[in-house]
Amino acid sequence: MKILLTGASGYIGKRLLPVLVQNGHEVICCVRNLKRFTVPEHLKASTNIIQVNFLDKDSLKSIPKDIDGAFYLVGYMSESSDFRYLELECAYNFRTAINKTNVKHVVYLGDLLNAQSSLINLASKRIIEIELGRGKYNLTILRCGFIIGSGSY
């Protein structure tokens, strides 16, 4: 299968890429900055890198039409108070672009929210799930807590 991996330069994306390749998939890695992402030599034969910023609709034209599945690992970090709107815009632009492809299944890695989560955070994450769920593909939502591991910062 040909898989689109958004957030490929992030903590989860870097660890998911080799697993996908080892399982026989061709992976298209979406990164905002080509200079900040290097594919390990042993994965290069099954990997392509495209520069995509989900806040820039023109950059979405580089997403191939013949992809079978996608992982949505986009997390927008900002000091700005409107980062929740930016996250929603990314999700909307992703869904719009993916609906123009052959994708049959999208996997979204969301947050596991609890009673201590703010209502604003809870609502914004749920809105992203709803937005992604409006696509013409099947959607799997994985909710996890904060992930910390080797190399995270």
Per-range role (PLM):
Residues K2, E26, N48, H105, ...:
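Structural signature of beta-strand start/N-cap positions in the alpha/beta core
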Residues I3-H25:
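N-terminal Rossmann NAD(P)H-binding glycine-rich loop of SDR-like oxidoreductase domains
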Residues I3-L5, A70, V106:
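Conserved hydrophobic beta-strands of the Rossmann-like cofactor-binding core
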Residues H25-R32:
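Conserved glycine-rich Rossmann-like NAD(P)H-binding loop of the short-chain dehydrogenase/reductase
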Residues C30, L73, L142:
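The conserved SAM/SAH-binding core of class I Rossmann-like methyltransferase domains
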Residues K35-T101, L112-A115:
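NAD(P)H-binding glycine-rich loop region in Rossmannoid oxidoreductase-like domains
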Residues Y76-Y153:
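Glycine-/Pro-rich loop/turn segments that contact NAD(P) or position catalytic residues
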